[in-house]
UniProtKB/Swiss-Prot annotation:
This is Methionyl-tRNA formyltransferase. PANTHER family: METHIONYL-TRNA FORMYLTRANSFERASE, METHIONYL-TRNA FORMYLTRANSFERASE, MITOCHONDRIAL. Keywords: Protein biosynthesis, Transferase. Its EC number is 2.1.2.9. GO terms for molecular function: methionyl-tRNA formyltransferase activity. Coiled coil: none annotated. It is an enzyme of class 2 (transferase). It comes from Gluconobacter oxydans (strain 621H). It catalyses: L-methionyl-tRNA(fMet) + (6R)-10-formyltetrahydrofolate = N-formyl-L-methionyl-tRNA(fMet) + (6S)-5,6,7,8-tetrahydrofolate + H(+). InterPro entries: Fmt, Formyl_trans_C, Formyl_trans_C_sf, Formyl_transf_N, Formyl_transf_N_sf, Formyl_transferase-like_C_sf, GART_AS, Met-tRNA-FMT_C. One of its GO terms (cellular component) is cytosol. It holds the Pfam family Formyl_trans_N. Attaches a formyl group to the free amino group of methionyl-tRNA(fMet). The formyl group appears to play a dual role in the initiator identity of N-formylmethionyl-tRNA by promoting its recognition by IF2 and preventing the misappropriation of this tRNA by the elongation apparatus.
């Protein structure tokens, strides 16, 4: 088929590769414009931009498309059979949704209608879901409300992070959208029951509340790794927590946030959490044992 691909982050790249490997003609790639990044704030192209250029595909980087009629006309002029959208980052107006012969298909990283919105991967882990998955959706003007063509589930393990689940779902998404284009299954409207929304994440979502249970905090850490990252403070120093182990059977009477013994086992509202890896400002992630060698933490120390 003659396709347009629209995507921006690493999540989108396997889908672009899968479409090319399946023999589809990708006539143009739309992605977010280069953004300042790194300490020098040099302009950096998106992962999809890099992948498209490596494949010799025309790249378009409009800053906005919703009300730009010239962009609508340029999009329609590509005469595509379909557009495949994977974490593009811009809202598409009806003029663009309706332009391709088969419309626009979205690769969404959840089992719709659960976790519509911006952070479905992180939200599934933080909420303690037993599974996640990918939905191939016929896009409409709503927020992830379109009819679903195909879905594929994958279990969420007790050690999955947003990073590991992201990588698994991105590969599933590429495979599934190729199948959707080949089979063209009948779209099934999403049920009205079971709708949840995944809000856009900010750094504040990472702040640990030690009055919560050890299991909940563990899910927060895993669900927000690598970004925005879960964090706490020790003596006014922000510590990013990279990995931890919940100890639900730990019996203690200490206040939440208090260290138990000469270690980084922290009292929680229910149970306790052993911090395994953490990061100080300006430093690399390190093991708890390496941290304690340089900065002993006495029993009864409070983290907030």
């Amino acid at each position: 088929m003659r396709l347009i691909f629209m995507g921006t982050p690493d999540f989108s790249v396997p889908a672009l590769h899968a479409l090319l490997d399946a023999g589809h003609e990708v006539v143009a790639v739309y992605t977010q414009p280069p953004r300042p990044a790194g300490r020098g704030k040099a302009l950096r192209r998106s992962p999809v931009h890099e992948a498209a250029e490596a494949a010799g595909i025309e790249v378009r980087t409009p800053a906005r498309v919703r009300r730009d009629t010239a962009e609508h006309e340029a999009f329609a002029a590509l005469n595509a059979d379909a557009a495949v959208v994977a974490a593009y980052g811009l809202i598409l107006p009806k003029a663009m949704l309706d332009a391709p012969r088969l419309g626009c298909l979205n690769i969404h990283a959840s089992l719709l209608p659960r976790w519509r919105g911006a952070s479905p991967i992180q939200s599934a882990i933080v909420a303690g879901d037993s599974q996640s998955g990918v939905s191939i959706m016929q896009m409409d003007e709503g927020l992830d409300t379109g009819a679903v063509l195909l879905e594929e589930a994958t279990p969420i393990s007790a050690t999955d992070t947003a990073s590991t689940l992201h990588d698994r779902l991105s590969e599933i998404g590429g495979r599934l959208v190729v199948r959707a284009l080949a089979e063209q299954p009948k779209p099934v409207p999403q049920p009205e029951d079971g709708v949840t929304y995944a809000e856009r994440l900010t750094r504040d979502h990472g702040r640990i509340d030690w009055t919560r249970s050890a299991a909940e905090i563990d899910r927060q850490i895993r669900g927000l790794t690598p970004w925005p990252g879960a964090f706490t403070t020790l003596d006014d120093v922000v510590l990013k927590i990279g990995a931890a182990t919940p100890l639900p059977a730990e019996s203690h009477s200490a206040a939440p946030g208090t260290t138990l013994g000469e270690s980084l086992t922290i009292a929680c509202g229910t149970g306790a959490l052993r911090i395994d890896r953490l990061q100080k400002p300006g430093r690399s992630m390190m093991s708890a044992s390496d941290f304690l060698r340089g900065q002993p933490v006495p029993k009864g120390t409070r983290l907030v």
